[in-house]
């Protein structure tokens, strides 16, 4: 299953906490099944796109970073995979 996750840094995160966040990220590496990772140009967070059937791994990642940021994870489909259900809905 494909997911897009938006992460938002907690407001007013001190530089020392940003350093600790980067240390955690360096240690953990990319999330299991990560396809892409984009950072917001305004410096407030970013987005990851991943594919996984293991919700437990995603939960473990969210817990590891929860002191620094919040998450919104949404299941997504590629457009070509959505066309069949859309056509069925419209018929």
Across the structure, where does each feature detected by a protein language model lie?
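Conserved, structured core segments of small domains
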Residues: 1-91
């Amino acid at each position: 299953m494909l997911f897009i996750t938006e992460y938002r840094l907690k407001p007013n995160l001190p530089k020392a906490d940003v350093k600790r966040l980067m240390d955690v990220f360096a240690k953990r590496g990319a999330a299991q099944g990560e396809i892409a990772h984009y950072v917001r140009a305004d410096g407030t967070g970013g987005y990851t796109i991943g594919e996984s059937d293991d919700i437990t791994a995603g939960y473990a990642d969210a817990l590891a970073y929860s002191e620094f940021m919040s998450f919104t994870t949404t299941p997504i489909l590629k457009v070509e995979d959505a066309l069949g259900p859309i056509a069925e809905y419209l018929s």
